[in-house]
């Protein structure tokens, strides 16, 4: 049986080598994940040819790139990256950055 009520805090983790990822929920149509970036870690700019993606900041703040735009987003902010648009994020603060990430259709 699937868990339809998920507390993201039980999935928060860290990896000293690269940013930490955990899958919260997945179907054929959507994947929701948690990305945790320690100070100095980044998800390099990349794109998805047939998938839209969003980031929602749960904790901390990050420097997000979407296309030609580069902006800081903090708690409660949504960052939208349509298919084919290059996107990425870097944690330039001393605090952990925790992001809810969604991608559709699921990989």
Which positions does each model-derived feature cover?
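Conserved short histidine dyad/triad with adjacent acidic residue
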Residues: 18, 33-48
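Ligand-binding loop in jelly-roll beta-barrel domains
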Residues: 83-107
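A short, N-terminal "cap"/entry segment at the start of jelly-roll beta-barrel domains
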Residues: 1-30, 44
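Well-ordered beta-strand scaffold positions
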Residues: 30, 35, 61, 69-71
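Short, conserved beta-strand element in jelly-roll/cupin
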Residues: 36-37, 49-64
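A generic "binding-loop/recognition-motif" signal
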Residues: 30, 50, 69, 85, ...
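Short acidic-glycine-tyrosine-enriched beta hairpin
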Residues: 69-83
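Histidine-centered metal-chelating micro-motifs
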Residues: 42-44, 63, 79, 83-89
């Amino acid at each position: 049986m699937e868990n339809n009520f998920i507390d993201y805090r039980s999935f928060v983790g860290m990896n000293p080598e690269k940013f930490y990822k955990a899958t919260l929920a997945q179907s054929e149509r959507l994947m929701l994940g948690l990305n945790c970036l320690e100070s100095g870690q980044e998800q390099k700019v990349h794109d998805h040819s047939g998938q839209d993606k969003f980031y929602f900041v749960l904790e901390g703040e990050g420097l997000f790139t979407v296309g030609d735009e580069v902006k800081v987003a903090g708690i409660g902010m949504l960052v939208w990256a349509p298919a084919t648009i290059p996107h990425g994020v870097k944690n330039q603060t001393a605090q952990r950055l925790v992001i809810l990430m969604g991608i559709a259709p699921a990989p």
